[in-house]
C-alpha cells in the first residue's frame, strides 16, 4: 500500500519531536510558561463570519507559495481583517517555525493559532511557551485518549482548541469529545484534493458549536454561500500566493467592489480605506464625472486601488495612450463597441491591461462569450443614472465574472450583494453631487458589505 502524504508527515513529526526534546527539554522551559492568553473562543464570537487568516510559506501540494515571506508585513495587513491569525509552524513540509508565533503576535492584538501536527503533549507546552493562544488538534491523527490529553493541557494553559475533522466519523467523535470549535477541512489529507461539499454536507449536522470551514476558499461568492451554514473561515493558500495581499483579502472577504466616477484624491483615499478593490476614472467625453489625466495620474500614484479607465465609443489610439501612460488596471468600454473594435483594441493595448465590457440591461441578459473580455458590467444605462434595472432577471445566472452597477446605494446594497455577482459598482448612490463622493455613505455601504 502506498504511503500517504499525511503518514509521511506524522512519521517525520515523531522524529522532529524526539530531536526537539533533546535540544529543548520540557524541564528547561515548563516553569517559564506564561498562562496569560488572548481568548481564542471570544474572538470567534465577535463577528459573523469571522476569518482566521493564515501565515503559510509553503505546502506539500503547492510547494513554495510565497517567496517573499515577510511575517511582519503579512501580520500588519491581516490584523485589519482577521479575528485570529494562524501560524504554520511545521518546518519540513510547510517551511514554518515555532518562533514565527512571537514575531506575528508582537504585531497584532488578535489571538494566535499554532497550526501544526500535534501528537505529543510536549508540543502543546512548546506552543504556549512561544506565545500561541490556541492550537489545532486533528482527529485524523489523534485517537480519543490522545485528544483528551492534549486538550486538557491546552485548557490548563488557558489555550483555545480548534478541532479539525475531515469526515462524518470524525465529526461524531468531535461531538462526543465536546469540542467547542469544529473546523471542517475541505482538503483530503491523504491525496490533498479539495471538495467544498465536505462543508456543505457536514456543517448541517453540527449543533451548538462554532463551525469553521477550512481550505479551498478562493472566491467571495463561496464565502457568501457558506456563511449561511458556518460561522467562519480559515484561509491561507489562496491569499499567500497572491502578490498584492491586501487587495486580494478585500476581494475575497468583501468582493470585487468598485467606486466609479472618482474626481478627487481625497475620495479615492476614503474608497481604498473602506475596502474597495477598484476605483473608476471616467474619460468618456459626455460624462458629468469626467476626470482629467493630471488628476488621474496623481490619484493613481497616491492610492493602491486598481484603477479602471471608463471610455465610451472613443478613438482606440486615445484609449491605448491614456491606459498605458497611466498604467491602468483595466479599460472599461461603456458604449456600443463591437467585437471588431475590441479585437483591434486588444492587439494595440499592453497585455497586462485588462478589458471590461459594460452592458445596459433591459429585459434580457447578454451572452457572456465575447473574445478578449476579462469582466462584464451589468448597468441600468450609460452610467451614473442612479437607477436600477430589474434584478430579478439575474436569478439562476452564473455571474462570477460580472460586476453589478446602476443605482446601488445604502438602502439596497444588501439585496444587491446577495445576487452572486463578483462585486458591486457604486457611483451616484454614494455621491453628494456628480463626481463628489459622500464619505459617510461609502463608509456605511462597506460596513454593510463586511457582514
UniProtKB/Swiss-Prot annotation:
This is Tryptophan biosynthesis protein TrpCF. Residues 1-256 are annotated as: Indole-3-glycerol phosphate synthase. GO terms for biological process: L-tryptophan biosynthetic process. The keyword Repeat does not apply. Pathway: Amino-acid biosynthesis; L-tryptophan biosynthesis; L-tryptophan from chorismate: step 3/5; Amino-acid biosynthesis; L-tryptophan biosynthesis; L-tryptophan from chorismate: step 4/5. The lineage of its organism: Bacteria, Pseudomonadati, Pseudomonadota, Gammaproteobacteria, Enterobacterales. Its EC number is 4.1.1.48, 5.3.1.24. The gene is trpC. Bifunctional enzyme that catalyzes two sequential steps of tryptophan biosynthetic pathway. The first reaction is catalyzed by the isomerase, coded by the TrpF domain; the second reaction is catalyzed by the synthase, coded by the TrpC domain. Monomer. NCBIfam families: PRK09427.1. It catalyses: N-(5-phospho-beta-D-ribosyl)anthranilate = 1-(2-carboxyphenylamino)-1-deoxy-D-ribulose 5-phosphate; 1-(2-carboxyphenylamino)-1-deoxy-D-ribulose 5-phosphate + H(+) = (1S,2R)-1-C-(indol-3-yl)glycerol 3-phosphate + CO2 + H2O. Residues 257-451 are annotated as: N-(5'-phosphoribosyl)anthranilate isomerase. PROSITE patterns: IGPS. In the N-terminal section; belongs to the TrpC family. In the C-terminal section; belongs to the TrpF family. Keywords: Amino-acid biosynthesis, Aromatic amino acid biosynthesis, Decarboxylase, Isomerase, Lyase, Multifunctional enzyme, Tryptophan biosynthesis. GO terms for molecular function: indole-3-glycerol-phosphate synthase activity; phosphoribosylanthranilate isomerase activity. CDD domains: IGPS, PRAI. It comes from Buchnera aphidicola subsp. Schizaphis graminum (strain Sg).
Amino acid at each position: 500500500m502506498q504511503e500517504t502524504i499525511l503518514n509521511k508527515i506524522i512519521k517525520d513529526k515523531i522524529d522532529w519531536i524526539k530531536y526537539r526534546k533533546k535540544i529543548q527539554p520540557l524541564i528547561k522551559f515548563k516553569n517559564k510558561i506564561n498562562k496569560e492568553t488572548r481568548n481564542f473562543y471570544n474572538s470567534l464570537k465577535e463577528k459573523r463570519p469571522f476569518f482566521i487568516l493564515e501565515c503559510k510559506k509553503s505546502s506539500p501540494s503547492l510547494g513554495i507559495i510565497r517567496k517573499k515571506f515577510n511575517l511582519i508585513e503579512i501580520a500588519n495587513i491581516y490584523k485589519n481583517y482577521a479575528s485570529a491569525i494562524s501560524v504554520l509552524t511545521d518546518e519540513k513540509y510547510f517551511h514554518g517555525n515555532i518562533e514565527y508565533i512571537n514575531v506575528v503576535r508582537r504585531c497584532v492584538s488578535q489571538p494566535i493559532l499554532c497550526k501544526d501536527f500535534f501528537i505529543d503533549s510536549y508540543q502543546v507546552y512548546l506552543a504556549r511557551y512561544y506565545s500561541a493562544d490556541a492550537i489545532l488538534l486533528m482527529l485524523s491523527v489523534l485517537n480519543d485518549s490522545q485528544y483528551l490529553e492534549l486538550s486538557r493541557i491546552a485548557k490548563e494553559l488557558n489555550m483555545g482548541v480548534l478541532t479539525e475533522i475531515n469526515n462524518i466519523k470524525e465529526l461524531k467523535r468531535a461531538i462526543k469529545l465536546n469540542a467547542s470549535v469544529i473546523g471542517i477541512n475541505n482538503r483530503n489529507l491523504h491525496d490533498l484534493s479539495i471538495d467544498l461539499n465536505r462543508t456543505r454536507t457536514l456543517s448541517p449536522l453540527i449543533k451548538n458549536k462554532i463551525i469553521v470551514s477550512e481550505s479551498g476558499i478562493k472566491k467571495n461568492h463561496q464565502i457568501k454561500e457558506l456563511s449561511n451554514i458556518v460561522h467562519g473561515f480559515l484561509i491561507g493558500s489562496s491569499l499567500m500566493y497572491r502578490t498584492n495581499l491586501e487587495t486580494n483579502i478585500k476581494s475575497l472577504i468583501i468582493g470585487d467592489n468598485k467606486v466609479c466616477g472618482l474626481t478627487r484624491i481625497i475620495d479615492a483615499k476614503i474608497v481604498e480605506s473602506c475596502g474597495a478593490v477598484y476605483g473608476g476614472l471616467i474619460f468618456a467625453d459626455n460624462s458629468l464625472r469626467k476626470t482629467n489625466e493630471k488628476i488621474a495620474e496623481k490619484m493613481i500614484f497616491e492610492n493602491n486601488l486598481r484603477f479602471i479607465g471608463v471610455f465610451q465609443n472613443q478613438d482606440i489610439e486615445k484609449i491605448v495612450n491614456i491606459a498605458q501612460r497611466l498604467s491602468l488596471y483595466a479599460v472599461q468600454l461603456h458604449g456600443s463597441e463591437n467585437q471588431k473594435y475590441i479585437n483591434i483594441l486588444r492587439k494595440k493595448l499592453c497585455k497586462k491591461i485588462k478589458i471590461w465590457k459594460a452592458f445596459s440591461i433591459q429585459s434580457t441578459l447578454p451572452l457572456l462569450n465575447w473574445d478578449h473580455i476579462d469582466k462584464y458590467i451589468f448597468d441600468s444605462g450609460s452610467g451614473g443614472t442612479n437607477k436600477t434595472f430589474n434584478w430579478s432577471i439575474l436569478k439562476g445566472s452564473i455571474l462570477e465574472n460580472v460586476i453589478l452597477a446602476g443605482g446601488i446605494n445604502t438602502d439596497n446594497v444588501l439585496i444587491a450583494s446577495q445576487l452572486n455577482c463578483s462585486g458591486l459598482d457604486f457611483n451616484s448612490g454614494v455621491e453628494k453631487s456628480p463626481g463628489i463622493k459622500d464619505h459617510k455613505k461609502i463608509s456605511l455601504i462597506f460596513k454593510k458589505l463586511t457582514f
